[in-house]
Amino acid sequence: MKREVEILAPAGSWECLEAAVCAGADAIYIGGSRFGARAHADNLNEERMLEAIDYVHLHGRKLYMTVNTLLKEQELGELVDYLRPYYEQGLDAVIVQDIGAMRLIREAFPDLPLHVSTQATVTQTLSAQLFQRMGAERIVPARELSLEEIKNMKNATGLEIECFVHGALCYCYSGQCLMSSMIGGRSGNRGECAQPCRLPYRVENRKSADLMSLKDLCTIDMIPELVEAGIDSFKIEGRMKQPDYVYTVTQMYRKYIDIYLQKGKKGFHVTKEDKEKLENCYRRRGYCDGYYRKQNGKEMLSFEASRKRDGTEERKKWITYYRKKIDGTLNLAEGTVSELTVWLHDRPEMTVTVTGDMVQTAKKSTPCGRTDRKADTENRKYPVCI
């Protein structure tokens, strides 16, 4: 097949950015210091973001910046100045939720591509056409659409279509959740979702369970269907994930999209070993195929506790086999750089030293912790392994 399909990988840090590039992503989406829907990610400051734009361009890739929160009145006046240095550096696109922000960006930067965020809740063709008239070049439809609905939107508008293919799913409609704001005072539409849907809840006369927590999305087996539906960009969720997750998932989708584009359906088959690699990389509560084939299916829900995996079985076996006792010293003296040195208990000549920030005395007025909550440490162990 001659059609090109973009792999769009997440980056919540510089390390994740490098991992995405190395794994074969065509483009990376990342948040800056403001206006992004992942306020608690290790977002880049202005200097590092400018470096990131140059870095991906040197590797022949693209960088999309998230401006996907709802802006307040006073923030609109700051948005143009915030984006200007990135625009001048060659930023490839901005992903936007707020309609007012879209209009402002289009007026200030007429040739900067606008991508409509999934947070804008584009659920049908008329909405897509509205954004098209506003100058959008790409739509990220609401996650709740079926493949047939996505195909119709593509055919009716001719816009680029970007869809999530892997990662976490929200219980509520994209961009319409107020639960975090109501329960915890942290709005998902301001980049501070506390993920209350991941918590256990108790229904009357029943045991507590994770009643609103969806399984993670995985569409590696559906690549032929997604391509044929007209999806232009395969988006991987995970700006809060670690570099090894970004690398592994991006690499897998790169591999199998290329296989399908080169060999078609007859040559397309995802091996059991590669599926296991995806599962071992990160799996919250099992996988599902989202809303693409069946809407509102109860099989999307998991009532079990989270089963996050943070490494391969081989890595776990290696850690178990090589677990050794270590000794160490931590030097903290005011006005000096903090320094930690560790060594093997039975081989003191094998040492590692790392340094950190300058040590400062804490002010009395600075709260250093909370006394109204107790950490559950009785059943937890935190071994240090070399």
Regions flagged by a language model, labelled:
Residues 120:
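Conserved catalytic-core segments of large NTP-driven translation/proteostasis enzymes
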Residues 105:
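RNase H-like DDE/DDD metal-dependent nuclease/strand-transfer catalytic core used by mobile genetic elements
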Residues 100-101:
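Alpha-helix capping/helix-boundary segments
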Residues 125-126:
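Conserved nucleotide-cofactor-binding alpha/beta core module
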Residues 1-22, 27-30, 34, 59-69, ...:
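Surface-exposed amphipathic alpha-helical tracts and adjacent flexible/coil segments at the periphery
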Residues 38-57, 191:
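Glycine-rich, positively charged N-terminal anion/phosphate-binding segment
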